[in-house]
Regions:
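Bacterial N-terminal signal peptides that target proteins for export
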Residues: 1-14
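Short S/T/G/P-rich N-terminal loop/turn motif that feeds into the first structured element of a domain
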Residues: 27-299
Length: 299
């Protein structure tokens, strides 16, 4: 658990988790060699009770095969929830919003791929209770350091809704965290994104919204984060912690944190990811038998 997030668990007033090493993590369509994408698009599938696990993997395998057969340059990776509602996230990264538009057009204009995706979506829809998407923009000024997708297995995602008229307080709070962590835990990394389109999560109020994700190789990093937070508190001292609590109370309307795990079987990663971690990414998608496919289609 990242230090910012941990404050939520301890019931403190300070509600600002900040950690996200998206670097090549979300560079599926990003041409940058390093660093997070400028635009992050996430599609969320909320599953009906009992419709997750291998059943959902089999359904998603149709999408993976469709993109592979088309030799499409569209790439994404999947995350399965380990907390909160049962859901899967499908994550795509772009250099800009124009590239997002081009990627959508490439699918629509490929009649064979478009038909295969439509068919897969129809079958997959029987497993879903709802579906939505959100598009976000990178905020480098609220981010710290860079990480790597290599070895990453978990995503800790935190959403913040900022009170109207208090964006400056939120920015100040984020910078205070960054300045302190540079001193006590210089290996700390995070990337922050601001929501441009869509709601961050069902039930969240509207307003300026920021999404922060901590990528982890293992959950042992949660334990390390707790130790780092003790150093962080000592660095700030009583007056610094009080100032942070004031800024938190002034700027944050609501926040929530959830944990997700990468699912390579439902992912369509770029080749460079596979080359670096073939044992993890190069796994066959869960196949759907003809009997299962017919059963799903007829539900």
């Amino acid at each position: 658990m990242h230090p910012f997030t941990r404050k939520l668990s301890f019931g403190c007033a300070m509600l600002l988790p900040f950690a996200f090493s998206l670097s090549p993590v979300l560079n599926a369509q990003n041409t940058q060699d390093d660093g997070p994408p400028n635009v992050l698009v996430t599609q969320r599938e909320y599953l009906k009770p009992g419709k997750g696990g291998m059943l959902h993997e089999r359904s998603e395998s149709a999408f993976v095969r469709a993109f592979a057969n088309a030799k499409s340059n569209s790439h994404y990776f999947a995350l399965d929830s380990l907390s909160g509602p049962t859901r899967s996230l499908f994550v795509m990264g772009y250099n800009n919003f124009a590239d997002w538009e081009k990627d959508r057009a490439s699918i629509i204009n490929d009649k064979v791929l478009n038909a295969a995706v439509d068919h897969a979506a129809e079958m997959d829809g029987d497993l879903l209770s709802s579906y939505d998407s959100v598009a976000m923009m990178l905020r480098p000024d609220l981010s710290l350091n860079k990480g790597s997708i290599n070895g990453t297995r978990y995503f800790e995602i935190t959403t913040f809704v900022v009170k109207p008229g208090h964006r400056h307080d939120f920015d100040q709070l984020a910078h205070m965290y960054a300045d302190a962590y540079k001193k006590v835990a210089p290996d700390t990394h995070w990337d922050c994104f601001e929501v441009m389109y869509g709601n961050p999560a069902p039930g969240f109020p509207s307003g300026a919204t920021f999404v922060v994700i901590n990528t982890m190789k293992s959950q042992a990093e949660t334990d390390k984060g707790m130790a780092d937070f003790e150093k962080f508190s000592k660095e700030l001292g009583t007056s610094g912690m009080e100032k942070m609590e004031e800024l938190t109370a002034a700027s944050i309307e609501t926040t929530g944190t959830n944990l997700f795990q990468i699912n390579p079987r439902m992912s369509n990663p770029p080749q460079e990811w596979i080359d670096k971690e073939p044992a993890f990414w190069k796994v066959p998608p869960t196949s759907m038998t003809k009997e299962t496919a017919l059963k799903t289609a007829n539900q």
